Amino acid sequence: HQDTDHVGAVESDSPGLFKEAVLYVGETENRYLTGETRRKVIYHMYKLPQVTINNEKVLLTDGQVIDIDGIKIECLLVPGHTWGHMVYLIDDKYLFTGDTIWFGADGGYSFIAALAEDNKLAVKSLAELEARLQKRNLRPMFITGHTGWTDNFEFAFAHKDKLCSPFKKRVPDPTAPYDA
């Protein structure tokens, strides 16, 4: 998604490490990059600065499967954190969740409440993601954008109906790398 902690290396004013990289982004998420939509955080009280990207873009849709050098990537829309937030299922084995799930020591929660565009939608999307994976009998490794990874399906969705609150201190998973 377009939050600068995830796309900062391709922003037009970045040092240039990825100036030639092709950016794969969901159609809805791209509206933030074009300026059509502004990102709001802290319970919609603040707008984040506009992220400007000049790279070539490939726009993605929910359920679309792409192949990059023999690697199968399935794009799954999970709106809530942002309106166009997607997760990416790689070869049916690895699920890159970005800011969809926050792992605490006792399991996964819907990502930080204060940073969501729509908290109810975020919770609903997380439950729908679980159902989509269950329907296909998939048990991927979950790789989050901030709180590590797990291969424990039940742990990943343990608190899918609850939001991670920035005002309630929760011990992070002591076994996970932690960068938040």
Task: Show where each model-derived region lies.
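Well-ordered beta-strand scaffold positions
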Residues: 28, 64, 71, 93-94
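Metallo-beta-lactamase
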Residues: 72-77, 83-155
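Acidic, His/Gly-rich catalytic cores of divalent-metal-dependent hydrolytic chemistry
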Residues: 126-135, 150, 154-180
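Active-site HxH/HxHxD metal-binding segment of metal-dependent hydrolases
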Residues: 2-64, 161-162, 166-179
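A conserved mid-domain beta-alpha-beta active-site/ligand-binding segment of alpha/beta enzyme cores
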Residues: 59, 68-71
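Histidine-centered divalent metal-coordination motifs
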Residues: 1-6, 81, 146
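Short, conserved clusters of charged catalytic residues that mark active-site
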Residues: 5-8, 70, 124
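Short secondary-structure boundary/capping segments
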Residues: 14-15, 65, 87, 133
